[in-house]
């Protein structure tokens, strides 16, 4: 009995075709034991029937062409992102087919912990569809179905960030597609793909495999960790960007990592409204996450940055942005309750990239083509010479204080005490730790009154 006849089992191909390593193992078993063929075909038929039943149950009845979705998989239909202005159904269906169809499986990593858009363990896959378009997608291993994904040409930013406040070192890979950075909407007629976040441990990639089923750890030039391995793979696949990681030359928090002693922290804790998150200051922009909606403030989308609500222990960062797809659309984002300990580092970062001056936005957009975020020596000199408006305000307060001391009135002590009490109540309300000792902060006399200072 030839191996060719085994490969002609259509029911096995249908049931296990999307999982090529498993399909290959089945055929190898059949080649060694041909008498098992009826059993494997019965299993394949049962699996195929389950897949058909699941697909029919999950599919909405007769969806309209304008509601075609670029992401298929389990989950409530309202959570699926629709194609913007979906009249371009030919292009939409092509993108959808490329993501879900059988494709050349190049690399897969089992049991990855995804946080966005779904919080579950899935199999990460990198595939190549007909036409040489490569996809990054996530497969439900139990149902053998694609949950979500994105074509590599549609990926705008890829970040690899340390997970804050964990006892064990971990990294989050963040995939930000075009039209889903939280600032610029997709172009009319273009599909909108989900942002994707998954977590990897700081260890060898034991669950990573080549498309043939060979463990990736057998590779001679394999990186030692999940982070290094996936970063090198993604950099190889990405054509117009690269994986961006935190850099000490850009920003390091003044507050060390609390759960891993001696390790530097690259994040800043902040709030957007009532939602707590982490801000990372990177070489290509500012990221805020890790909960939906993620926001990435690319340099070419930032009009200006200012500081507001400057208190004894905290301040707010206001980022004015302009959409790249709709230049008339501007919006301001406020990241609040940032610890004053991180002000010097944040201010140095803002000046380094000249984000404080809206008149320089065109120059920043021109430099955005350089994804390495490099800048010339003359720009550094300008940044160093640019004086912080917050420090100017502080000196003005000091001068005013000197003048008040000359006209000191003992009867004013009560007002001064009241101001200090208000400031302490403000701090106690937010429950922040006092990192202010020994720092050059806005004078405590400012109390709970917020001063808006634009950089």
From Swiss-Prot:
<dbReference type="GO" id="GO:0005634">
    <property type="term" value="C:nucleus"/>
</dbReference>
<feature type="compositionally biased region" description="Basic and acidic residues">
    <location>
        <begin position="374"/>
        <end position="397"/>
    </location>
</feature>
<keyword id="KW-0158">Chromosome</keyword>
<dbReference type="InterPro" id="IPR013719">
    <property type="entry name" value="RTT106/SPT16-like_middle_dom"/>
</dbReference>
<dbReference type="InterPro" id="IPR011993">
    <property type="entry name" value="PH-like_dom_sf"/>
</dbReference>
<comment type="subunit">
    <text>Interacts with histones H3 and H4.</text>
</comment>
<feature type="region of interest" description="Disordered">
    <location>
        <begin position="51"/>
        <end position="93"/>
    </location>
</feature>
<comment type="similarity">
    <text>Belongs to the RTT106 family.</text>
</comment>
<dbReference type="Pfam" id="PF08512">
    <property type="entry name" value="Rttp106-like_middle"/>
</dbReference>
<feature type="compositionally biased region" description="Low complexity">
    <location>
        <begin position="55"/>
        <end position="70"/>
    </location>
</feature>
<keyword id="KW-0804">Transcription</keyword>
<feature type="compositionally biased region" description="Basic and acidic residues">
    <location>
        <begin position="432"/>
        <end position="446"/>
    </location>
</feature>
<keyword id="KW-0238">DNA-binding</keyword>
<dbReference type="GO" id="GO:0031491">
    <property type="term" value="F:nucleosome binding"/>
</dbReference>
<dbReference type="GO" id="GO:0003677">
    <property type="term" value="F:DNA binding"/>
</dbReference>
<keyword id="KW-0805">Transcription regulation</keyword>
<keyword id="KW-0539">Nucleus</keyword>
<feature type="compositionally biased region" description="Acidic residues">
    <location>
        <begin position="398"/>
        <end position="416"/>
    </location>
</feature>
<comment type="function">
    <text>Histones H3 and H4 chaperone involved in the nucleosome formation and heterochromatin silencing. Required for the deposition of H3K56ac-carrying H3-H4 complex onto newly-replicated DNA. Plays a role in the transcriptional regulation of the cell-cycle dependent histone genes by creating a repressive structure at the core histone gene promoter.</text>
</comment>
<dbReference type="GO" id="GO:0005694">
    <property type="term" value="C:chromosome"/>
</dbReference>
<feature type="region of interest" description="Disordered">
    <location>
        <begin position="371"/>
        <end position="455"/>
    </location>
</feature>
<dbReference type="InterPro" id="IPR050454">
    <property type="entry name" value="RTT106/SSRP1_HistChap/FACT"/>
</dbReference>
<keyword id="KW-0143">Chaperone</keyword>
<protein>
    <recommendedName>
        <fullName>Histone chaperone RTT106</fullName>
    </recommendedName>
</protein>
<dbReference type="GO" id="GO:0042393">
    <property type="term" value="F:histone binding"/>
</dbReference>
């Amino acid at each position: 009995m030839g191996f060719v006849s085994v490969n002609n089992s259509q029911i096995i191909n249908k049931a296990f075709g999307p999982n090529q390593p498993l399909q290959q193992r089945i055929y190898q078993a059949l080649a060694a034991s041909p008498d098992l063929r009826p059993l494997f075909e019965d299993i394949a038929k049962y699996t195929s029937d389950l897949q058909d039943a699941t697909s029919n149950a999950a599919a909405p009845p007769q969806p309209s062409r304008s509601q075609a979705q670029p992401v298929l998989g389990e989950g409530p239909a309202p959570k699926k992102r629709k194609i913007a202005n979906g009249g371009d159904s030919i292009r939409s269906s092509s993108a959808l087919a490329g993501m879900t169809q059988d494709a050349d499986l190049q690399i897969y990593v089992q049991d990855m912990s995804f946080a966005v858009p779904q919080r579950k363990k899935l199999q990460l896959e990198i595939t190549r569809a007909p036409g040489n378009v490569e996809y990054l997608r996530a497969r439900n291993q139990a149902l053998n179905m694609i949950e979500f994904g994105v074509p590599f040409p549609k990926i705008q930013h890829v970040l690899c960030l340390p997970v804050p406040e964990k006892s064990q070192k971990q990294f989050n890979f963040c995939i930000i597609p075009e039209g889903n950075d939280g600032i610029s909407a997709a172009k009319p007629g273009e599909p909108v793909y989900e942002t994707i976040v998954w977590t990897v441990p700081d260890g060898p990639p034991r669950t990573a495999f080549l498309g043939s089923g060979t463990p990736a750890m057998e590779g001679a030039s394999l990186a030692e960790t999940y982070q290094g391995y996936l970063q090198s793979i993604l950099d190889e696949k990405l054509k117009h960007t690269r994986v961006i990681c935190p850099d000490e030359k850009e920003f390091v928090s003044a507050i060390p990592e609390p759960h891993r002693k001696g390790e530097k922290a690259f994040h800043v804790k902040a709030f957007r409204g009532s939602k707590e998150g982490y801000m990372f200051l990177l070489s290509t922009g500012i990221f805020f996450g890790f909960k939906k909606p993620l926001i990435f403030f690319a340099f070419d989308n930032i009009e200006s940055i200012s500081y507001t609500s400057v208190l004894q222990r905290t301040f707010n960062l206001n980022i004015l942005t302009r959409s790249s797809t709709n230049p008339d659309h501007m919006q301001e984002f406020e990241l609040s309750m940032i610890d004053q300990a991180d002000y010097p580092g944040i201010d140095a970062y803002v000046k380094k990239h000249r984000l404080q001056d809206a008149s320089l936005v065109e120059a920043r957009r021109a430099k955005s083509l350089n994804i390495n975020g490099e800048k010339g020596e003359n720009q550094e000199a300008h940044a160093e010479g640019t004086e912080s408006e917050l420090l100017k305000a502080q000196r003005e307060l000091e001068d005013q204080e000197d003048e008040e001391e000359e006209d000191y009135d003992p009867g004013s002590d009560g007002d001064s005490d009241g101001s200090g009490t208000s400031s302490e109540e403000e701090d106690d309300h937010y429950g922040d730790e006092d990192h202010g000792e020994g720092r050059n902060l806005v004078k405590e006399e400012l109390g709970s009154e917020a001063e808006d200072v634009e950089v």
